Amino acid sequence: MSGHNRWSKIKRQKAAMGATKGKLYSKVVKEITVASRLGGGEPSGNARLRVALAAAREANIPKDTIERAIKKGTGELEGENYEEVTYEGYGPGGVAILVECLTDNRNRTAADMRSTFSAYGGNLGAEGAVAWMFQKKGVISVKYGPSEDQLMEQAIDAGAEDVIMLGDEGSEVRTAAADLHTVAGRLQESGLPLGQQRWVFLPQNTVALDVDTVKKLLKLLDALEENDDVQNVHGNYEIEDAMLDSLLQ
């Protein structure tokens, strides 16, 4: 597995336990609220809400918490009016970074992003500075299953674009952004044990980094993800597995 994918997986695992579990809950609940506000509270007619609800189940968020989040989005309960904002910038080593946020105070979040990038060796860019380097895709985690050839055949038949094998950690099925829910449904019908479903921004090209730059970059990524307004952080970095292993020891 590439260092980029492994680091992303490690971050998701860390978010599912310990002190960061509450932060994961908050992010998922925010997404449910916004998805409900934009597309309505019925999952059958709201693909974004379906993906958010799948993330809530994966995170074991209580049903009543989910229902309140939906009602806040539809206006049945009073709640914050979150705005979607994506910030773009560069990190150490010239790594391009996209930061997806949901905020109730755009000015506060912009100031936080600017100061965080600056404090950790990066700089916040203008809109469009790095977005062109990424493509939005759907990603479906498969916990275990058939051989690579069999999984590839099933995935392509279901409408997927690619399959990435992750060794003992299962595999990822990648789809066009608009096809995420459709492909996931077809794979589930075929009996595959699916995990998380999500949209990601995948880099078209990656930047290889030395160990000192990786250390600086990981500090920036951690700082960005600690911000309560941040939902997702994407970068075009590539970290060698051996290097990542040594840094995590």
Swiss-Prot record:
GO terms for molecular function: DNA binding. Keywords: Cytoplasm, DNA-binding, Transcription, Transcription regulation. One of its GO terms (cellular component) is cytosol. InterPro entries: Integrase-like_N, TACO1_YebC-like_2nd/3rd_dom, TACO1_YebC_N, Transcrip_reg_TACO1-like, Transcrip_reg_TACO1-like_dom3, YebC-like. One of its GO terms (biological process) is regulation of DNA-templated transcription. Its main location: cytoplasm. It is found in: Cytoplasm. PANTHER family: TRANSCRIPTIONAL REGULATORY PROTEIN YEBC-RELATED, TRANSLATIONAL ACTIVATOR OF CYTOCHROME C OXIDASE 1. Belongs to the TACO1 family. This is Probable transcriptional regulatory protein MXAN_4974.
